[in-house]
Amino acid sequence: MYRVKSESDCEMIHQEQMDSPVADDGSSGGSPHRGGGPPLKKGPWTSAEDAILVDYVKKHGEGNWNAVQKNTGLFRCGKSCRLRWANHLRPNLKKGAFTAEEERLIIQLHSKMGNKWARMAAHLPGRTDNEIKNYWNTRIKRCQRAGLPIYPTSVCNQSSNEDQQCSSDFDCGENLSNDLLNANGLYLPDFTCDNFIANSEALPYAPHLSAVSISNLLGQSFASKSCSFMDQVNQTGMLKQSDGVLPGLSDTINGVISSVDQFSNDSEKLKQAVGFDYLHEANSTSKIIAPFGGALNGSHAFLNGNFSASRPTSGPLKMELPSLQDTESDPNSWLKYTVAPALQPTELVDPYLQSPAATPSVKSECASPRNSGLLEELVHEAQTLRSGKNQQTSVISSSSSVGTPCNTTVLSPEFDMCQEYWEEQHPGPFLNDCAPFSGNSFTESTPPVSAASPDIFQLSKVSPAQSTSMGSGEQVMGPKYEPGDTSPHPENFRPDALFSGNTADPSVFNNAIAMLLGNDLSIDCRPVLGDGIMFNSSSWSNMPHACEMSEFK
């Protein structure tokens, strides 16, 4: 239950409030005096009060402003004493208006700090924060009334330049710290020739080519075009063999990188010069290109110019037959190419088996690598030709491995003339009986390997006088094929098999040399009977003609 106050109770409470002390309103900013002493004084300071405060600060120093009232008997609060000393009684205070230099400094400081009056007063000795604030507020009102900008143009430009400089200094410092961190963990990768194996534009192997001279590798003609090829490969090998990091290795690394870039270009030139890229037709009237990379069934022989990746190859393989060399042959001939001893078996993989078709390049000046000229191959081929009359020869595979362009057969007008002549003399399919000496004469159980389609063999007319001089009663030797057989590829035409025949005519050897050194091997056709048709290479048209001789017995 609530107790209701009576009139007597209300009168007693009012009497107690009248007897309690009241705060002095005249005190200068201090809290109401609740003690038993006199009340604090408010209002402006008198000269007597200023003298008491100055004397106290000289004796006790600045600070502890609440003790002024106790020690001096001055009836002012601590806050009032501090402000009076800082704004009016300090000995280093500057009186009067601000100078032009002080005004310029205030504008610059305000553009950087804003309304930080105490911090700005620290940069202006003798000026108080209150004076700076009053000056700035007065200036803003004056500029607004006159329509002038608060900050002058010079101050704005200076501020923007300083900001950009600060940002650039920060970026430079950050980059420097990153460089120092990277320098502590410096890593230099090894540049090896193995990095170029996966590249379709590079060589299929990375041998130590220092053992192979340029003259033996590509001949004098190609060496003059890219004489810096061996130097670049040697530089790459030297970098790979280096064990430690030298202080001046940065210049060497830059040179190696530029050499590696040029090495890729030179490797493309090497591939084109050796004849691995594309082989053109020898007939000048035809522009059809026979791409590289067809597959031949039943051929695993060196006379096809193919290296087996499944069989190890030991020692140097010298693709040269001394008895068949000619002094006027092309120095870039494949017969002078010698494989380096450091060549490993696993490095003999044909890169075109897994690479896409490259862009057709210029016509190669090198002879076809199909004519290896090994004595064992000649003997074995002669034996196979005697027993291969009843064997079936498989058709050229339309494609090899992944990414390998299909094989293409290019026909020439001379081929049609030869076909018409053959049909008049011997009824039956022309291509089935026109089988050259090929590497396909080996067993058909051997797996197919990659091969190329060289240039076109051209047929030319032979005068009756020439036919008589070569012997009219003999026939041109060549293997027999059944009517149902398909002729093997003409790129493997081997006139070296003539040595295994029973003949002692010196012209046979001359004709074999002439046909062996021919660059442009082409269409499927064989020497035929009669006095009007014979083989002739487009690039070696001035060489002796092949004579007619009896078949193998």
UniProtKB/Swiss-Prot annotation:
Q: Which PROSITE patterns match?
A: HTH_MYB (PS51294)
Q: Which InterPro entries match?
A: GAMYB-like (IPR016310), Homeodomain-like_sf (IPR009057), Myb_dom (IPR017930), SANT/Myb (IPR001005)
Task: Cite the record's Gly residues compositional bias ranges.
Answer: 27-38
Q: Which Pfam families match?
A: Myb_DNA-binding
Record field: compositional bias (Basic and acidic residues): 1-17
Question: SMART domains per the record?
Answer: SANT
For molecular function, the Gene Ontology terms on record are:
DNA binding
What region holds the HTH myb-type domain?
A: 37-89, 90-144
> Which residue ranges are recorded for the region named Disordered?
1-45, 464-488
Location(s), subcellular: Nucleus
Task: Please report what switches on or represses expression of this protein.
Answer: By gibberellin in aleurone cells.
UniProt keywords, alphabetically:
Activator, Developmental protein, Differentiation, DNA-binding, Flowering, Nucleus, Repeat, Transcription, Transcription regulation
GO biological process: what's one of them?
regulation of DNA-templated transcription
Residue ranges annotated as transmembrane are none
- Which parts of this chain does the entry mark as a DNA-binding region? 65-89, 117-140
* A single cellular component GO annotation: nucleus
> What functional role does this protein have?
Transcriptional activator of gibberellin-dependent alpha-amylase expression in aleurone cells. Involved in pollen and floral organs development. May bind to the 5'-TAACAAA-3' box of alpha-amylase promoter.
Query: What name is this protein filed under?
Result: Transcription factor GAMYB
Q: Which organism is it from?
A: Oryza sativa subsp. indica
Q: Which gene encodes it?
A: GAM1
